[in-house]
Amino acid sequence: MSWIERILAKPKINKRRGVPEGVWSKCTACGNIIYKADLERSLNVCPKCDHHMRVTGRSRLDIFLDKDNREEIGTDLEPKDVLRFKDSKKYKDRIAAAQKSTGENDALIAEKGTVKGVPLVAVAFDFNFMGGSMASVVGAKFVLAAEVCLKHRIPLVCFSASGGARMQEALMSLMQMAKTSAALARMSEEGLPFISILTDPTMGGVSASLAMLGDIHIAEPKALIGFAGPRVIEQTVRQTLPEGFQRAEFLLEHGAIDMITDRRDMRDTVARLLAKMQNLPSTEATEVSVNE
């Protein structure tokens, strides 16, 4: 090889090995690249911008409840395609696909357990299951959870994450709004606390029923909360909505919710509130310091 060929020859570049999948995550708000193990330790909250990423319903209960003495409620309930509904796809096929991808039987998970030693029932919507939509099984499982609360005289905590009622079940889905509201009315008559925790997003029939019937309403930061979406409202009223409209901070400022709590502080906050609401003796829960 001549001297000119040596100069013009392309240098050998060692190809970098591919990064294994599942090692890194990207914040959907600020674009920060986060080591997945660090993200899990921060409960899926971005360590740079504090953006609260969406989590599954089961993960939310695992984060919230104490590890021991947990009992799942309504595991035998299965959705049925009574109407034989079909849009671009058969409803029964949508159910099967959602069950396969999430590992859940429907969009609500309910468990009896404790948080910092305080007994309760906690339910959580899974937005990954058909948008967390409320259907017959969701309503039935929520009512079962309320009945367990009534039987054992313990409070109920609900984590909402839903697009609203499930259109494939039509009127039967809308009936769950009344059904769940009636169950909460029974709890209220018995003086049992219900804390509603609004996460991103809480919309439609869920926001118009059980999600806004709490004794206390807590939201995660910047959660989208409302009935119709902002784009639909703007198209209907033909006006530009205020900045931050339907976000948790906007609702807090206008008195629609009681407080906004970081996910990493949720266990402490709820345990302390429940201890006060039930006049429990001095426990670990009552000693937690919460910024109010």
UniProtKB/Swiss-Prot annotation:
Its cofactor is Zn(2+). It is found in: Cytoplasm. Pathway: Lipid metabolism; malonyl-CoA biosynthesis; malonyl-CoA from acetyl-CoA: step 1/1. It is an enzyme of class 2 (transferase). InterPro entries: AcCoA_carboxyl_beta, Acetyl_CoA_COase_Trfase_b_su, ClpP/crotonase-like_dom_sf, COA_CT_N, Znf-ACC. A zinc finger (C4-type) spans 27-49. Its EC number is 2.1.3.15. Zn(2+) binds at residues 27, 30, 46, 49. Keywords: ATP-binding, Cytoplasm, Fatty acid biosynthesis, Fatty acid metabolism, Lipid biosynthesis, Lipid metabolism, Metal-binding, Nucleotide-binding, Transferase, Zinc, Zinc-finger. Coiled coil: none annotated. It holds the Pfam family Carboxyl_trans. The keyword Lipid biosynthesis applies. One of its GO terms (cellular component) is acetate CoA-transferase complex. GO terms for biological process: fatty acid biosynthetic process; malonyl-CoA biosynthetic process. Residues 23-292 form the CoA carboxyltransferase N-terminal domain. PANTHER family: ACETYL-COENZYME A CARBOXYLASE CARBOXYL TRANSFERASE SUBUNIT BETA, CHLOROPLASTIC. Component of the acetyl coenzyme A carboxylase (ACC) complex. Biotin carboxylase (BC) catalyzes the carboxylation of biotin on its carrier protein (BCCP) and then the CO(2) group is transferred by the transcarboxylase to acetyl-CoA to form malonyl-CoA. This is Acetyl-coenzyme A carboxylase carboxyl transferase subunit beta. It comes from Idiomarina loihiensis (strain ATCC BAA-735 / DSM 15497 / L2-TR). The gene is accD.
